[in-house]
Amino acid sequence: TVSRGGNYLLNIGPDALGDVPEKSVEALHQIGEFMRLNGESIYGTRPAPTYPYDVDWGYFTVKPHKLYIHLFEDMPDVYLINMGNKPRRCYLLADGTELELRERITCEHVHSWRIFLPVKRIPQIDTVICVEVEEESIWFEKITD
């Protein structure tokens, strides 16, 4: 939702007796823990420019000099092509674990990033990778023929 400029509303309220159901309390605790570890990737962010390819594993949010990659699947690595920015640093937002990012430029001058994820990491519904870049704005290269 945030990655497209929206807000996420929680439909949580009391039952007829004025008690908040236990499942709702658990959901609030999970969201609170996620936000404690990864709130930087949500608060004050903007939607990323439209990525030129469809991805079914996650979404992007941005702040100046930062791209946040939200992964909703357990993956050994992330491969992104048509990356317009020069990466400086790459890490898991939840615990600061530094990640290996390999930048590649093809003979057609298309830039790609391959980010390698650790096998053991904090289990989360949304694993957030932060890539700090040299440029203030995040941009993706256009697809060329």
Language-model regions: role of each:
Residues 1-145:
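Mature catalytic domains of secreted/periplasmic carbohydrate-active enzymes
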